Amino acid sequence: MQNRQIIEPKRSIDVIHETDVLVVGSGPGGLSAAIASARCGVKTTLLERFGCFGGNITVVGVEGFAWYRHEKTVEAGGIGREFEELAKEMGAAVPESQSLSYELDSEGFKLVADKLVMDSGIHPMLHRSFSMP
């Protein structure tokens, strides 16, 4: 098969924001990466295409991540556990019926995510998409 190329014309793009770390997508992985980065003192921007943080958990209503804890669970703690504890404090979580965890609905997840993003000093950019120039 012959290699083909797409040639893009030169264009000027205005710079609207500068950052050290850009995290694209705010699902559980993106949120954790952005929070960890910001807590290290790095200028961090979190970009999300929808109007709220959380990815599929909040936009589609996919089941949350805090359902796994049982009596013999070995757990590392970390941001996921911190997220669950903050949700309990904020009244955004209820005991999960099949485990020792707490479950968060998508609306509760949004509230907790917003608080963690703002408290961590992350620069949020909602309703944005990313493309390479």
Protein language model features and the residues they cover:
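Conserved N-terminal/central alpha/beta ligand/cofactor-binding core
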Residues: 2, 10, 16-18, 36, ...
